[in-house]
C-alpha cells in the first residue's frame, strides 16, 4: 500500500524549512550613532542651561542654585552638578544684594524707652503767709462711676491694647455674641483658631481675619494670606512672657512644639532653632530633632556651638535680654551679659526697622519668623506650605513686609520647612507640611509665650 502524504512531501517540508524568514541583524554602528546624538543633545541642553544669559533660564538657574545651597544636605545638587564659576557667580550676586546683612548696619542698636516714666516735679515751696497754719484739707472724693462709664473705660482699654482690631467689626461681633462680654472687656477670650475652625467675623485694621483674642494673656491671632499661601500671625503683647524652652531630650531627641509649650506653661509657641537632620545610622532626613544646629541660650543656660558660616551666608544670633528686647547680632560677637535667651539661624529680616531684602531665600517654602514691634510686642509668624491647606509657602521677603506692616523693628527667620508650626491654647493652629505629622516634627527647642494668668498663679 502506498504511503499517503496528507500535508505534502518530505521534500516540500524540507524546502519550506530552508526558506524560513531570516532575522535582521542589529547594526551596532547605528545604535551607537543614536546614543551619541542623544548624549550630544543633552550636553548641548546642559551647556545652554548653565551658560545662557537668557533672562528666563538665568532666573530659574539662580533659583535652583539658591535652593540647593540653602539646604543642609542637598548643596551637592549645585556644587557637584554645576561648574564652580557658575555657582560662585550666583553667590557673588547674592552677596551684593545682601551685603547689608554682613555689616554693622545689620546689628540691633535700639533701646527701650519707657514713656510712662515719672516726670521730675519741682519741690514744694512753703508759702510765707501760711507757714504757721496747720490745716488738713481733704481732697474731694470723686463720684463713683456708673456701670456704663466703667464699661466704656474697659472698652477703651481693650482697643488701646489690641490696637490692630477694627472697632466696627469688633462691636458687631459683640452684638451678635453678647456672651463674649459675660465677664467684661478685660476678660474676653475668643478662640476660633483651630484647624477645623473658620475664624471670626472680626477683622484687623489691615483687613486680616481675627482668629483669637485672649485679653487675660494679651494674645491676638490673625489669619494672613497672599498669592498661593496662608498662615497665622500671632501677637504677644507682653514680651516678658517670652522665653526659649528646650526639649527635655536636647542632645538626644526632640519634642513637638506642643509638648514643649504644655510642659513649660505656655499659651503660645512656635518653631525656633534648626537641628542636624540625621539619625543614629547616619541617614539624612530621618533626624529626631534632638541635635541642635548652632548655639542657643535658654533661661540663662547656654547650649551648642556657634555656626560662623553656613551655605555661604553667616548665621545671625537673636538675643532676648533682661530688658525684654530682641537684639540681632553677628554670631562672632560676644554673647551679651544681659542675654537670657538666644538662638542662631539665618537670615536677619528686619534690623532697627530696616527691611533687609534678600535674593537668597526666595523659594516658596513653609516659613517661620519671629520679631518685635515698635510697641515691644512679640510677633510670631508661621506660613504653611508644600500644599498644606492649599498653601505652597512664600519667601522671607514677603514675610518681612508683612511683619513691617505691623510695626516690626527686629525680625529673624527661624527653621522652616517641615519644622514650621505654631501652637496656641492646646492645639496646633497651622498645619505641618508633612500631613502624616499632625503635631509636627520633634524640635530641639521652641519659642514659648507663657500664660500671664498661670504665671501670676504660681508667684
Pin down the residues of each PLM region.
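Gly/Ser/Thr/Pro-rich low-complexity, intrinsically disordered segments
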Residues: 2-459
Amino acid at each position: 500500500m502506498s504511503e499517503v502524504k496528507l500535508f505534502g512531501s518530505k521534500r516540500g517540508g524540507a524546502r519550506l524549512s530552508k526558506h524560513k524568514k531570516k532575522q535582521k541583524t542589529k547594526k551596532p554602528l547605528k545604535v551607537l550613532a543614536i546614543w551619541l546624538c542623544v548624549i550630544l543633545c543633552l550636553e548641548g541642553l546642559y551647556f545652554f542651561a548653565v551658560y545662557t544669559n537668557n533672562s528666563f533660564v538665568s532666573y530659574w538657574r539662580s533659583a535652583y542654585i539658591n535652593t540647593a545651597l540653602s539646604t543642609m544636605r542637598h548643596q551637592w545638587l549645585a556644587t557637584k552638578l554645576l561648574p564652580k564659576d557658575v555657582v560662585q557667580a550666583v553667590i557673588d550676586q547674592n552677596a551684593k544684594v545682601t551685603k547689608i546683612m554682613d555689616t554693622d548696619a545689620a546689628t540691633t542698636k535700639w533701646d527701650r524707652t519707657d514713656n510712662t516714666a515719672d516726670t521730675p516735679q519741682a519741690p514744694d515751696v512753703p508759702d510765707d503767709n501760711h507757714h504757721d497754719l496747720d490745716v488738713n484739707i481733704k481732697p474731694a472724693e470723686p463720684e463713683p462711676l456708673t456701670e456704663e462709664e466703667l464699661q466704656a473705660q474697659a472698652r477703651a482699654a481693650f482697643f488701646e491694647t489690641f490696637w490692630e482690631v477694627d472697632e466696627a467689626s469688633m462691636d458687631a461681633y459683640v452684638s451678635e455674641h453678647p456672651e463674649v462680654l459675660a465677664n467684661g472687656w478685660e476678660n474676653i477670650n475668643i478662640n476660633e483658631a483651630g484647624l477645623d475652625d473658620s475664624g471670626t467675623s472680626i477683622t484687623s485694621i489691615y483687613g486680616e481675619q481675627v482668629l483669637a483674642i485672649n485679653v487675660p494673656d494679651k494674645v491676638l491671632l490673625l489669619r494672613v494670606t497672599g498669592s498661593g499661601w496662608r498662615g497665622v500671625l500671632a501677637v504677644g503683647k507682653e514680651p516678658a512672657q517670652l522665653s526659649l524652652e528646650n526639649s527635655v531630650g536636647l542632645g538626644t531627641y526632640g519634642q513637638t512644639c506642643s509638648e514643649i509649650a504644655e510642659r513649660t506653661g505656655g499659651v503660645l509657641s512656635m518653631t525656633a532653632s534648626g537641628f542636624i537632620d540625621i539619625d543614629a545610622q547616619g541617614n539624612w532626613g530621618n533626624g529626631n530633632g534632638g541635635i541642635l544646629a548652632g548655639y542657643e541660650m535658654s533661661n540663662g543656660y547656654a547650649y551648642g556651638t556657634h555656626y560662623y558660616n553656613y551655605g555661604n551666608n553667616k548665621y545671625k544670633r537673636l538675643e532676648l535680654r533682661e530688658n525684654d528686647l530682641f537684639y540681632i547680632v553677628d554670631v562672632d560677637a560676644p554673647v551679651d551679659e544681659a542675654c537670657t535667651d538666644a538662638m542662631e539661624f539665618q537670615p536677619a529680616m528686619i534690623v532697627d526697622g530696616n527691611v533687609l531684602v534678600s535674593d537668597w531665600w526666595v523659594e516658596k517654602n513653609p516659613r517661620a519668623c519671629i520679631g518685635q514691634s515698635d510697641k515691644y510686642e512679640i510677633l510670631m509668624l508661621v506660613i504653611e506650605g508644600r500644599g498644606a491647606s492649599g498653601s505652597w509657602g512664600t519667601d522671607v521677603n514677603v514675610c518681612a513686609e508683612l511683619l513691617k506692616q505691623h510695626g516690626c523693628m527686629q525680625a529673624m527667620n527661624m527653621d522652616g520647612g517641615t519644622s514650621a508650626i505654631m501652637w496656641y491654647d492646646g492645639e496646633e493652629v497651622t498645619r505641618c507640611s508633612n500631613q502624616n505629622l499632625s503635631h509636627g516634627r520633634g524640635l530641639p527647642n521652641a519659642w514659648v509665650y507663657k500664660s500671664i494668668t498661670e504665671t501670676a498663679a504660681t508667684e
